[in-house]
Regions:
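Conserved, non-catalytic sequence blocks in retroelement Pol enzymes and Pol-derived host proteins
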Residues: 103, 215-219, 295-302, 390-392
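Cytochrome P450 proximal C-terminal region
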Residues: 28, 117, 134, 165-166, ...
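Conserved cytochrome P450 K-helix/beta-meander segment immediately N-terminal to the heme-binding cysteine loop
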Residues: 344-371
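Conserved cytochrome P450 K-helix E-x-x-R motif and the immediately C-terminal K′/meander segment
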Residues: 12-32, 205, 209, 291-332
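N-terminal membrane-proximal hinge/A-helix region immediately C-terminal to the signal-anchor transmembrane segment
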Residues: 1-92, 107, 111-119, 139, ...
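Cytochrome P450 heme-thiolate monooxygenase catalytic core
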Residues: 1-4, 24, 65-71, 89, ...
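Cytochrome P450 catalytic-core helices
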Residues: 258-283, 394-409
Length: 443
């Protein structure tokens, strides 16, 4: 197996810590199959070939579990939720949660998405400068709070958002803190860690309160938490309060981060690519003529869907997946020893020139049915894959298309000059300094 050269003991800590995304990209170009990368006396295997990625996520998925180091961090926040659990427990939780994400159930949330998007836009004014990232995070948080818990007071939603921001900041992979803490097994930034622990405790208390209230009216309620409370496994068992809390927190993060970031990066890319913006607006004018989109419109909004796909190719909210070999395993003729960490980077693979012509360019029109058919399946995997494919994928895709269609019909977004746009690889890939845009009336 090829190995990346590095410094004694430090290995590749410095370039990985300084700019993880750039390091992953350069590594993928140099080693198109896979490569062993050393960091602080340990290391991981970066897998870059789509067919090998498919072996890890699908063909040999039973030979891998969630990466141990990441799981320790994730479990401190999400407990034993779908994001951080493994094995039979994960399978049981997935079975219990799956009915809440059936296609018919998801379609029922279209009105909720339109309602909250319209409410957000009602407060926007032509000519003002807004942080679009903040707006998208707030709007999708309200949507997922309503879908998960039913109608909630705005103050509670704001407090949940503040807790999540503090928690997500703890997982920033830009800089060396997280890598060093993993290697040394102890906390370095004590003040940041204390803020994080306080946010976790407060989030737990808020969610516990909602669960307690929801149990009292579970038969009258029509939201995801009520479905989870009522769900029964094959043996008749239900989720405990702790399990409900863990899954609720997991769905909060997964349910609003992916769409909010997808839309934030989409508005940035559209602001930089005027031709794509004009083509998008023309499709919306032709199909919708100024009205809010319905579920029946989605098959007709082909370019709108292509815009979202291309945005998630270049700027995937989930920028990497990490696994650990549960046993000695052969992947494409390469021997991976038990206990070895494996990293799959959507950010790097989605920009591979072997599969994407002009990979650094924003070209939504590339996503024709013909192109999609010939593309190796795991050359593009923004929602992961295999048994652990994101349970909310259909919800996120529907939400992104509906919101984008509504907003672009009302507003043009012009990027404010002079700001730094820096992707921040945390659990998700956020814009570190936000995305300030000036609102213009759609022509």
């Amino acid at each position: 197996m090829p190995q990346m050269a590095g410094l004694p003991w430090l290995g590749n800590l410095l370039p990985m810590g300084a700019d993880p995304l750039d390091f992953l990209m350069r590594t993928a170009r140099r080693f198109p199959d896979l490569v062993y990368v050393r960091i602080l006396g340990s290391g991981y295997i970066q897998v870059n070939d789509p067919h090998l990625i498919e072996e890890v996520l699908v063909t040999r998925s039973g030979s891998f579990i969630k990466d141990k180091d990441l799981k320790v961090y994730a479990r401190a926040v999400f407990g034993n939720g779908l994001l951080s659990s493994d094995g039979e427990f994960w399978l049981r939780q997935r079975r219990l949660a799956q009915p809440a994400f059936h296609r018919e159930r998801i379609a029922g949330y279209a009105d909720l998405i339109r309602e909250h998007t319209a409410q957000a836009m009602a407060s926007w004014r032509v000519g003002e400068v807004r942080d679009v990232h903040v707006d998208m995070m707030e709007t999708t948080l309200k949507i997922v709070a309503h879908a998960l818990f039913g109608a909630q007071k705005d103050e509670s939603i704001v407090e949940i958002g503040e807790c999540l921001d503090t928690i997500m900041a703890r997982f920033d992979f830009r800089g060396l803190t997280v890598l060093l803490e993993q290697a040394l097994g102890r906390v370095i930034d004590r003040a940041k860690h204390e803020r994080y622990e306080a946010a976790v405790r407060r989030l737990d208390a808020i969610v516990d309160g909602v669960i307690d209230r929801s149990r009292k009216d579970v038969h009258q309620a029509d939201h995801l938490l009520a479905m989870l409370i009522a769900a029964r496994d094959e043996d008749g068992s239900a989720m405990s309060d702790a399990q409900l809390r863990d899954e609720s927190k997991t769905m909060f993060i997964a349910g609003h981060e992916t769409t909010a970031l997808s839309l934030s990066w989409t508005f940035w890319l559209l602001a930089l690519n005027r031709d794509a913006h004009l083509r998008l607006r023309e499709e919306l004018r032709r199909v919708l003529d100024g009205r809010a989109p319905e579920m029946a419109d989605l098959p007709k909004l082909t370019y709108t869907d292509q815009v979202i796909r291309e945005s998630m190719r270049l700027m995937p909210p989930a920028w990497s997946i990490q696994r650990e070999a549960l046993m000695d395993v052969d992947i494409g003729g390469y021997q991976i020893p038990k206990g070895t960490n494996v990293l799959l980077s959507q950010y790097a693979v989605h920009r591979d020139p072997r599969f994407f012509r002009d990979p650094e360019s924003f070209r939504p029109e590339r996503w024709t049915p013909e192109f999609t058919r010939q593309l190796p399946k795991y050359a593009y995997f923004p929602f992961g894959g295999g048994p652990r494919l994101c349970i909310g994928q259909q919800f996120a895709q529907m939400e992104a298309v509906l919101m984008l269609a509504m907003i672009v019909q009302r507003f043009d977004m012009e990027l404010v000059a002079g700001q730094r746009i820096v992707p921040q690889p945390s659990i998700t890939m956020r814009p570190k300094y936000g995305l300030r845009m000036r609102l213009r009336a759609a022509e």
